[in-house]
Amino acid sequence: RHRARPSSTTAEMDWAGWALFGLVATTALTAALTAAQLAGLTRIDFPLLLGTLVTEDPDRARVVGFFLHLGAGQGFALGYTATFALLHRATWWIGALLGAVHVGIALTVLLPLLPGVHPRMASQRAGPASTAVLEPPGLFALNYGNQTPAVAAVVHIMYGVVLGLLLQPH
């Protein structure tokens, strides 16, 4: 007699993979973004943007912001890992699609909302007494350069590809 194998309706998440590969993917994204900045392709600086939420000193802000960015990358990697587990597979192209959705939300929702919560970012509602020193990103982060949306798309799709290649649901 043939016995049917029990099927699992829930895939287990790759916790060790998430912990390691989330850091790998975020470090790759940050390195690529920094390289694009140094090449003059964009003026966006995620570590500075995030770090100035905590401190006004730009040097300290970049250090603090780097670690905040790593933490945010881990949070997003958790979402990617959960998605791969739900789909029972992880591939480079699913990772790329998730990266495209990720950057789409970041450029059209998250970054445009930043002036409303960032204490050191200029906004149209801040008034004349504002001491804000950071330029708001604007829609698609175009205030940081015309190539910024393309740079952001490339590095976030790369982030998804890295996770899609390295993570495997169990």
Where are these regions (language model features)?
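Juxtamembrane/disordered regions of integral membrane proteins
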Residues: 2, 7-170
